[in-house]
């Protein structure tokens, strides 16, 4: 599979790429900004939640700076509230791998392709989600926001994964993500393959604009894409029109 394309490292997003996520990210942001008086039913809440959706994939600290640009104290307080709310939400949620995710990881490993999970979320969230989904032992490397100077859309998470995995060249790397920030990070890293998945919060057009070389419906379509060197059955080439699958969200 992966070795036919020369891919030796697959950098996958977490929630919405490998792991199903039924809105817990945005609900956690809603809880966090409510601690700062921005509550449901107000225009301020609607405006900020629209900003949250657009900024999905970025580090929580960066998102809060976007939401409270003129008040550092409120931004930091909201970030702390988010960092408490999300692990609690994961602990209460039924976290499962997306359909086909486990099989894809097994096929990548069988093809001698190392697997890294990258996220702009905190390490505690990364570990909790991987443990809950039963994926952690299938992954070679994990990189969270604490491990890098900058989260997505900067390329730091991807580049750190490359360094830790000791890949020979960036052309041997595939980045798979469902947010425009994650896809842009893959493009800026120079990765040979940058795949947008439609199980995340952002539509195909936005993923293409961010630099996706291919668009696939879900992680389950990755083996055919990498193995054949062509778009997987049912996938949308990066230059073609595509529609959004409204099933999940990604970080």
Language-model-derived ranges and their functions:
Residues 3-102, 107:
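N-terminal helical cap/lid subdomain that shapes the substrate entry/recognition surface
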Residues 174-214:
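Acidic, Mg2+-coordinating phosphoryl-transfer loop and its flanking beta/alpha structural elements
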Residues 29, 81, 101-131, 143:
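Substrate-recognition element of Asp-dependent hydrolases with the DxDx(T/V) motif
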Residues 150, 156-158, 171, 203-241, ...:
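Short acidic, glycine/proline-enriched helix-loop-strand junctions
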Residues 102-109, 162-163, 183-188:
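Surface-exposed amphipathic alpha-helices with a cationic face
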Residues 152-180:
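Conserved Lys-Pro-Asp/Glu-containing loop-to-beta segment of HAD-superfamily phosphomonoesterases
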Residues 48-52, 135-151, 172:
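A short, structured active-site edge motif that brings together acidic residues
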Residues 1-12, 232-246, 250-251:
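Non-catalytic pre-domain segments flanking phosphatase-related domains
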